[in-house]
Amino acid sequence: MNTKGLVNWAIWISVISGIYCLVYLFTVGQFTSDNVLPGWQIVYATFTALPIYFTAGAKREDFIKYICSYLLGVCWGMLYLWIMDRLAGMGIITNPWVNIAVVVAVVCTVECALHFTVLSKLPFSVVPAQFGAISNTFWCSNMSIAILGPGASAIGGFYNFQAIPILMITLCGGTLLGLLCNEGLNFIDAETGNWKWPGK
């Protein structure tokens, strides 16, 4: 694609992303700020899901695989935090940095081994997407602790999962945005870089 086409694609991506943010902030973001994390929202999780899917080509046929992998990644992230919390709460590993290092090393080994081998053909084994979701789960939980305090079931103060459903919605939104960004190529002539109607 020539420079004109790339510029037009950049315009498409920017406009679509702006529309997404506007819709998100007036719906999910407003709900989050009013009901989940008072005065806050987490639209920025979108921009973890989007680039991971987008740089992999954002193929239509991979859309569900990425959605499922992000959602499972959040579950993995919750498991990491739950184990860290239990180890801290029971006094087994009291140093938080050692706790995090040990749990990440062990659980990551199990996670990768499973998804690289016996689960590799299933539609939730895109490990980079899982890692992105795990990272988001960690900061989302920490942010929730900072705003609301540790979760009611946390015995070591390591987690608060209050905003996790919103995080899941946002990661799915980011995946959809990645698909829409890539679909913009259908409206650009690959040779001339001009706008066109798909199929013509």
Spans of features found by a protein language model:
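N-terminal topogenic module of multi-pass integral membrane proteins
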Residues: 1-47, 51
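Membrane-helix interfacial "entry" motifs
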Residues: 1-6, 54, 58-66, 92, ...
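Hydrophobic, lipid-facing residues on alpha-helical transmembrane segments of integral membrane proteins
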Residues: 7, 11-23, 27, 63-83, ...
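Helix-coil boundary and interhelical linker segments in multi-pass alpha-helical membrane proteins
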Residues: 27-34, 82-94, 156-163
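Pore- and pathway-forming membrane helices of multi-pass small-molecule/ion transporters and channels
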Residues: 31-57, 105-153
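Membrane-interface starts of transmembrane alpha-helices
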Residues: 35-42, 91-103, 162-166
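Short, highly charged, low-complexity non-transmembrane loops/tails of multi-pass membrane proteins
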Residues: 188-200
